[in-house]
């Protein structure tokens, strides 16, 4: 890996609602364009094939009509374009699994014909869309392991850390933000109702800072791509973002809506402070991270006669402010 680079592009794609064939064709055309710029990997947004920012309003029949299997027409179109151009590509869709369940899935099509699918872990888009149950990390011909976290998956620090612990040094973070407010801000994705705050003021600007922190904490590159539907084509500064393992921004799309591109210096991964701190972790201290809130409260109810190990007893005296100390 030493001395090698990987040229990537983050594409803030604007989808046409419900028109998977059109969106797949547009992505295929985009791969031709980025291939001319020497791009090896192009990252498109969450649900870029399916479209729709607000899937919760779709009827059961509409959602079923939108869903495709992983070997469906849209993925085949994209995979064929990858083979023609030599540019690996990540795209999002509503997946219909063989058992009939629906997932918010993201598929990475590689130049060697391999495909890797991540099912969103925290899916709250529609009551019929099921959450995935595992993290996705895989090897590549570039000598790095790549992880995928879709949308709100990357809001949780534990998910990003898990991909790093599974060996990922490049994190693909496709996203789909909400409709723009009157001020032009794009809200982040909602949490499941049971965890939701009555006031949610986080915006894409907030996520910009989170992603830089996640990259630095874990010593990994993060390639973030945000998408909108065609009726909501206002670009944002954070629509495409590439961050290095020190948390420094390598490239953004700016307000033009064009893709962001950067050369990833893969040798910088092991030199990063985040990787050094990963090696210094003490897992025996972190059991609490795997417990629910209810389990935490039971575990840390202090028993009677408990003493703090390693502490030093301190004594205090109350002295009148006018009394002289002797």
Kindly give the residue locations of the regions a language model identified.
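Active-site catalytic loop in hydrolytic enzyme cores
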Residues: 80, 97-209, 274-280
């Amino acid at each position: 890996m030493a001395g090698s680079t990987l040229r990537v592009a983050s594409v803030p794609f604007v989808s046409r609602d419900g028109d998977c064939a059109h969106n797949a064709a547009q992505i295929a055309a985009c791969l031709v364009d980025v291939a001319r710029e020497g791009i090896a990997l192009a990252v498109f947004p969450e649900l870029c094939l399916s479209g729709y920012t607000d899937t919760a309003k779709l009827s059961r029949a509409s959602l079923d009509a939108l869903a495709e299997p992983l070997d469906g027409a849209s993925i085949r179109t994209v995979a064929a374009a990858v083979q023609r151009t030599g540019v690996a590509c990540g795209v999002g869709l509503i997946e219909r699994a063989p058992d009939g369940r629906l997932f918010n899935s993201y598929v990475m099509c590689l130049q060697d014909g391999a495909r890797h699918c991540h099912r969103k872990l925290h899916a709250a888009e529609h009551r019929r869309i099921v959450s995935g149950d595992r993290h996705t990390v895989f090897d590549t011909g570039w000598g790095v392991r790549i992880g995928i976290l879709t949308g709100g998956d990357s809001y949780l620090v534990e998910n990003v850390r898990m991909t790093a612990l599974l060996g990922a040094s490049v994190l693909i973070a496709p996203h789909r933000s909400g409709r723009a407010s009157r001020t032009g801000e794009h809200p982040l994705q909602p949490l499941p109702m049971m965890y939701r705050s009555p006031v949610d003021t986080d915006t894409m600007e907030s996520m910009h800072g989170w992603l830089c922190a996640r990259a630095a904490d874990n010593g990994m590159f993060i390639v973030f791509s945000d998408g909108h539907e065609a009726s909501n084509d206002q670009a944002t500064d954070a629509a495409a973002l590439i961050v290095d393992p020190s948390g420094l921004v390598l490239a953004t799309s700016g307000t033009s809506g064009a893709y962001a591109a950067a050369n990833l210096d893969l040798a910088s991964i092991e030199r990063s402070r985040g990787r050094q701190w990963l090696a210094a972790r003490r897992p025996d201290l972190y059991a609490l991270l795997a417990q629910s809130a209810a389990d935490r409260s039971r575990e840390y109810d202090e028993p009677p006669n408990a003493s703090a190990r390693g502490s030093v007893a301190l004594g205090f005296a109350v002295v009148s402010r006018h009394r002289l100390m002797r």
